[in-house]
Amino acid sequence: MHLDILKNADPEVYAAIQSELERQTDTLELIASENFTSRAVMEACGSVMTNKYAEGYPGKRFYGGCEFVDVAEDLARDRAKKLFSCEYANVQPHSGSSANMAVIFTFCKPGDTILGFDLSHGGHLTHGSPVNFSGQFYNAHFYGVEKETGRIDMNRVEEKAKEVKPKLIICGASAYSRDWEYAEFRRIADSVDAILMADIAHPAGLIATGLLNDPMPHCHVVTTTTHKTLRGPRGGMILMGKDFENPMGIKAKTKTGERIKMVSELLDAMVMPGIQGGPLMHVIAGKAVAFGEALNPEYKQYMEQVRKNAAAMAEQFISLGYDIISGGTDNHLMLIDLRNKDITGKKTENLLHEAGITVNKNMVPFDDKSPFVTSGFRVGAAAMTTREMKEAEAKTIVKFIDKVISNAGSENISAICQEVKEEVNALCQQFPLYDFVPAS
């Protein structure tokens, strides 16, 4: 990643990239949806693949000269299928939101009912939020967590499904720290004749390595991002454990008559030309590299350490008097309720930023504050683990966070943040992010 040419060609963009490199190198990244890709992934994403238009799919492109981008996409698809032990993979979605849109558009018509996890309880915008297409085009209903436990009660999910009779049920979240009961969700979906979709954008790496429940045998369709715990480039993907005939009865003409189209055909057509045109072949090349990395034994060791680090952080937070929604974590993240600390998520995010620690403010279940203020914040262990930090460092980081929050009302808070920032920087120096380029 040598930027000498860029430095001379466009000093302003170069300066922004260099400053971002320094930020990532010298601060602690705890945003649960962020991670650090390898140099190999970045080289693939910065390659000549960016020059090629390739509308369509390998072997069936609308442009010529696609024989080598076909190789990259086939590698990405084959590796994804091997990684998740599934029969179908579409690696073209530009994002997790695009993947979700393609699935919802495939199975639902405008006005159909969908049932998803409440955004304010830890869900995602694309699961029915009224500010998103999923809540504007569809009749969206929600299930959430129980106030007493912070966990999803499957009996309540079943009651809601029977009440609203959705066409599609979505399981998955952006801020839920527990594993998902996919088999039970499937039983409920079958009872109301609904399609079941799992959005595993956050725990995908833990699922791929067998550390969390596998949605593939139970969910009709699975979507994910390719960054976060998968540690690849920013993008999306659609998977199916097993292809099947579409339940809407959409047919294709054959030489001898008609046949029911497979769901894979509908999904492929919805991704392109339905919602996208040309795929980002440089990103797909990066996805192929990342999936190859995830198939190595070292990746499972990494994911095991992510889980250990998250558990250590949760334990330390609890020992210091913090409330974690659901009382702990099964995956890489946790959601901290700050209402007993008399500080907002917004203020916490800002103060920690001053201290060299990046988190995001986050609504907690039954929050009485706006999404721009919030009563909580979210923490994830994936990025710090990529730096090879372990449980001891995880607990130290929580102590840094507590030092800032506990002194938030102090007249000396700026000086305290600076002290913590120096400690953070010293810790980061012990665990360098990249060894192929200096940080300044």
UniProtKB/Swiss-Prot annotation:
GO biological process assignments: glycine biosynthetic process from serine; tetrahydrofolate interconversion
Pathway(s) where this gene product acts: One-carbon metabolism; tetrahydrofolate interconversion; Amino-acid biosynthesis; glycine biosynthesis; glycine from L-serine: step 1/1
Source organism of this protein record: Chloroherpeton thalassium (strain ATCC 35110 / GB-78)
Cited HAMAP family: SHMT
Gene3D superfamilies per UniProt: Aspartate Aminotransferase, domain 1 (3.90.1150.10), Type I PLP-dependent aspartate aminotransferase-like (Major domain) (3.40.640.10)
Residues bound to (6S)-5,6,7,8-tetrahydrofolate: L119, G123, H124, L125, S370, P371, F372
Quaternary structure and partners: Homodimer.
Function: Catalyzes the reversible interconversion of serine and glycine with tetrahydrofolate (THF) serving as the one-carbon carrier. This reaction serves as the major source of one-carbon groups required for the biosynthesis of purines, thymidylate, methionine, and other important biomolecules. Also exhibits THF-independent aldolase activity toward beta-hydroxyamino acids, producing glycine and aldehydes, via a retro-aldol mechanism.
Main location: cytoplasm
Family per record: Belongs to the SHMT family.
Chain positions found as N6-(pyridoxal phosphate)lysine: K228
UniProt-listed SUPFAM superfamilies: PLP-dependent transferases (SSF53383)
Keywords from the UniProt entry: Amino-acid biosynthesis, Cytoplasm, One-carbon metabolism, Pyridoxal phosphate, Transferase
GO MF terms, alphabetically ordered: glycine hydroxymethyltransferase activity; pyridoxal phosphate binding
UniProt protein name: Serine hydroxymethyltransferase
EC number assigned by the record: 2.1.2.1
Residues flagged as site, Plays an important role in substrate specificity: H227
Gene: glyA
Cellular component aspect of the GO annotation: cytosol
Top EC category: transferase
